[in-house]
Amino acid sequence: MTIDRRRFLATLGASAAALATRGAAVGAGPLPRGKKVDRIGIQLYTLRKRASTDLPGVLAELSRIGYKEVEFAGYYKHPATEIREMLKQHGLTAPSAHVAIDLIETQSAQVFEDARIIGHEWITVPSLPRGRATTAEDWQRIAAQFNRVATHVKSAGFRFAFHNHNDIVRTAGDVLPIDILMRETDPVLVAFQMDIYWAVNGGADPLELLARYPGRFKMLHVKDGQRPPGDVQTDVGAGTIDFKSIFARAKGIEHYFVESDSPADPMAFAAASYKYLSHLDF
C-alpha cells in the first residue's frame, strides 16, 4: 500500500490539533502506516533436510506460519504434478526455482516442463560451479552465457535471474564481477536476485547496488547475520542488516524470500523471521 502524501499530511495535522485541544486524541484513528511485504516467501533450501523426507509437512507448517510463497531448490524426488497439488492444498505459490545453469542448458525440456506444471515464473541460477569464474575474462564469458540461456528461457515463457553470493562483489583483477554482469547482460533478458546477506558479507552496500543498478534486481533473498569478517547467519531481524532502509529503496522488487543456509532449527528460524517481516513497515 502506497501512502498518499496529501492524506498523510492532513491526518497528521488533524491528529496534532486534537492533541493540542484535548491533551490526547481520544478515539482518533492511527496514523497511516508504511508499506509491508504483501506475500512473504521462503527459500526451501533453508529446510532442505526435513523437506527431503516430509515436503508435505514442511509446506503445511510454513502455510500455518503465514508464508504465501516458496522458492524451490530441487523437488525432493516428487514429480511436478504432486508439487502442484501440495502447493494448492496449502494456499502457496512457487514463483521461482533455483536451477543450475548447466541443467538449464542440458535438460531444458524437463526444466521447463516442471516449471510450467508447478507454476514458476522465474528460472533462477543460484550460483556458478566453484572455480568457473575467477578473472574478468571469465565473467565476460559468463555474461554471454547468461544472455544465451536467458534467451532460451524467455522463448519458453519464463524469466531468467541470477542469485549472487559474495564473489560477485569482490574484485576480479581491477573490476567487480557484478559490474561486468550488469554491463554485458541484456536488461530485458537477465534480472538479478539480490542475496542481501551475501552482498554485505562480500563488502558491498545493498543500498548502493540498488541505486547504481535501478530496475535490475527483481527479487530479494532476505537473509540476516553479523558483519564481516564473520560468517554467522541469524534469524531475520536479529542481525545487523537494516532491512527497513533497504526495502524502502528497493524499487520494482516482486518477491521476497527468507533464507538461512544452515539454521540450528530451520522451522523456528522460519517462524521468527516471518514474525519480524510481517511487522516491518518501510
Protein language model features and the residues they cover:
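N-terminal secretory signal peptides and thylakoid transit peptides that target proteins
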Residues: 1-16
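Active-site mouth loops of central-metabolism enzymes
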Residues: 43-53, 98-104, 136
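Conserved, mostly hydrophobic/aromatic
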Residues: 42, 62, 70, 87, ...
